Each structure stands twice: as C-alpha cells, then as structure tokens.
Regions:
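Phosphate-group recognition and catalysis centered on beta-loop-alpha active-site segments
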Residues: 1-242
Length: 242
C-alpha cells in the first residue's frame, strides 16, 4: 500500500458504507513466536492480511528512539531496567520475548528502521506513551510532544513520511500539533460522546484529518455520534480485547 501524500492517506481512511473493515495490528501483532513492536512481527502480520500498525517507542540512553511500549524492558525482553539505562548498542545484547515470555531471535529495532521497512507498504499509528503513562512528569510530557513536532516539521526525521497517524489523548494535544503547522499526518482521537464530537466540530482541524476512536465496543446509544462522524467521512476505530 503506497501512501505518497497526505491526500492519499486521507483517502485511505475515508468512510463509505461499502468500505471493508480495516484491522489494525496492535503493536505489530502478538502471535506466538512474534514479539510486539518488532519488524519481523509486522512482516508476518502483513503477510496474513491488509493492515496498519499501532507502534510505540521509547528513548535510549543515547537518545535513539527504539520500538518499546513500556519505559522498561522487563516485560518484553530478556533484560531488565529502563530503556533509558542503556544505549542502543547495549540493548542489542537482549532478545525480544513473545507474549508467553518465550525468547525469540529478534532484537529491539530502532524507529527509523521500522519507518524505512514500512515506507510505501503500510500506515503507522504512533502512540505517544509519554503523554499518558503514570509517573511521567508534565515536563517530559510536553517535551515528548515538542519532539514529535520537531520531527514532523520540514527538515525533521519524519518529514519525508506520509504514512503516519498520531494517536492523541485530547483536543488540546491535537491543537498543539495543528497550531505548529503539522499538516502531513492524521489524528486518531477519542470521540465517545456528542460533546466530544461537537468540540472537534468547532475546532479548526478539518474532519478529513480525523480518525475517531470509540473505545472497546460499539454502543447503540452512540449511534447518533457514529452517524454524524460517518456523514463527515470519518472512519471509526474500536478495540477488541482478547
């Protein structure tokens, strides 16, 4: 799936009544033998079905963004400690483990390696864990958003990519990107009420930049909200908990 512009990204995520369901590979997929946030896992998932990938990253001691959901490596690797305790090269001594804690031959990838692998192949949904993780200071939260903005602006490391969706936790966060001139990504935002819908409807962000997240189930009580979103061409996203 080649996405060469924001217009092509928006077209891919435009709702229509006859549109097929698109399955998101959460953290790249979590099959036995395939760890989360791993290029090889994404490759395996993509070989099975058309999809896009929600991924997470944390920063190493030498400030390299690597694919890692947690701020520590304990749960998903054979090592222990915070991601920021190690340089990228030091992290390569550890192996990734699958969801059953089985060791795999795979290593922690850099974000830039994942982006290059996925270029012209798949869409990525970046989930900024620094925004909503407990124990992260307000200063670090702000700094993480500023980092995203710098990377997306002209000359930034992500500026050349047109296959990025940003998960944001609030309208205020979305507006920080929008008011900084970020126009080459879409935003995945929670719209689980009429009030949420009206807040975004009144914002300067056009609906063509929005994908609406509606939590873990389709709720008949929110049918009016779904209809309003669909009338604006907005696709909705929900989570299926295994």
């Amino acid at each position: 799936m080649r996405i060469g512009s924001i217009e092509e990204l928006q077209a891919y995520f435009t709702y229509s009544p006859d549109r097929d369901i698109v399955v998101s590979g959460h953290r790249g997929g979590m099959m036995a033998g395939y760890p989360e946030n791993c290029i090889e896992s994404c490759e395996k998932t993509l070989s099975l079905l058309p999809t896009f990938f929600e991924i997470d990253f944390s920063f190493t001691k030498d400030s390299i963004p690597v694919l890692m959901h947690d701020l520590t490596i304990d749960r998903t690797t054979t090592g222990k400690g915070r991601v920021s305790d190690y340089t990228y090269e030091e992290l390569q001594q550890f192996a990734l483990v699958d969801r059953h804690r089985k060791e795999t031959p795979y290593k922690i990838p850099r974000l830039k390696d994942m982006l290059e692998w996925g270029k012209d192949r798949v869409v990525f949904n970046f989930d900024n864990k620094y925004v909503n993780t407990k124990g992260v200071s307000d200063r670090v939260r702000r700094a993480s958003i500023d980092y995203y903005i710098r990377q997306l602006q002209p000359g930034g490391d992500w500026a050349e990519y047109h296959n990025i969706v940003l998960s944001v936790r609030s309208l205020d966060e979305a507006l920080r990107y929008w008011n900084s001139g970020i126009r080459q990504v879409m935003f995945c935002v929670e719209i689980s009420s009429r009030a949420d819908f009206e807040a975004y409807d009144a914002s300067p962000i056009p609906w063509r930049y929005i994908m609406a997240y509606i939590r873990t189930a389709v709720d008949p009580r929110l049918q009016e909200v779904y209809d309003l979103l669909h009338a604006r061409g907005v696709m909705t996203m929900t989570s299926i908990v295994e």
